[in-house]
């Protein structure tokens, strides 16, 4: 079934699920999207797809009624990052992110760049520690903290800079909700329904566990995109989350 919208305005969804689109071909991506309902999820577009297909892909998804998380993890000097974030807002995305390790001045500049957009501004989220990273990876970079400790330090800086939330692992969610409050949004990759393979994520949880931990938005990729019936898979995930709630 194909779901279309008459304009670029996005459908309202209460689902916390964000489906990660990872396709090498635009037609295959849109064929998948046309099988699912924008009431059941939002969509994430990352570096590879945006580099291949550009802003028009985002517009194509919006025209089908979907909110789009533009996952480009901007990390540059403050002025360049601010301009990039403003460009994302001009595109009408629902969420955009930056690397918290870019520092306070960079994050503050990104935040200020969204002020002219007022209520139409996207959520501005910072990446703390990539979910693929382990303690040994941080040590290689000269960081002596554990991934959890380093993520909390960066999350605290993010909140101090006035951003909307962070990308973090589900294991950090309980502590972060307690430390930073319910309004501080937690976006978590590495979410996989029971029985799914871990893939290249090292710190993973099921959707039900993530919801219980305090995750606001959960990114799920291949368990949905490679499903024989992605629409039903999404409905099953959302039903399980409603039972958990």
UniProtKB/Swiss-Prot annotation:
Which residues of the sequence carry a binding annotation for substrate?
A: 22, 44, 71-80, 131, 192, 201, 221-222
- Briefly, what is this protein's role? Catalyzes the decarboxylation of orotidine 5'-monophosphate (OMP) to uridine 5'-monophosphate (UMP).
Annotated Pfam families: OMPdecase
Q: How does it assemble?
A: Homodimer.
Q: Kindly give the InterPro entries that the UniProt entry links to this protein.
A: Aldolase_TIM, OMPdecase, OMPdecase_AS, OMPdecase_bac, OMPdeCOase_dom, RibuloseP-bd_barrel
Q: Which GO terms describe its biological process?
A: 'de novo' pyrimidine nucleobase biosynthetic process; 'de novo' UMP biosynthetic process
Write out the similarity annotation. Belongs to the OMP decarboxylase family. Type 1 subfamily.
Q: In which pathway does it act?
A: Pyrimidine metabolism; UMP biosynthesis via de novo pathway; UMP from orotate: step 2/2
Instruction: Tell me which GO cellular component terms the UniProt record holds.
Output: cytosol
What is the active site of this protein? 73
> What is the designated name of this protein?
Orotidine 5'-phosphate decarboxylase
Q: Has keyword Lyase?
A: yes
Q: Which organism is it from?
A: Salmonella typhimurium (strain LT2 / SGSC1412 / ATCC 700720)
Keywords, alphabetical? Decarboxylase, Lyase, Pyrimidine biosynthesis
Q: Does the keyword Lyase apply?
A: yes
Which branch of life, at top level?
Answer: Bacteria
Q: Which residues form a coiled coil?
A: none
Q: What is its EC number?
A: 4.1.1.23
Catalytic activity line of the entry? orotidine 5'-phosphate + H(+) = UMP + CO2
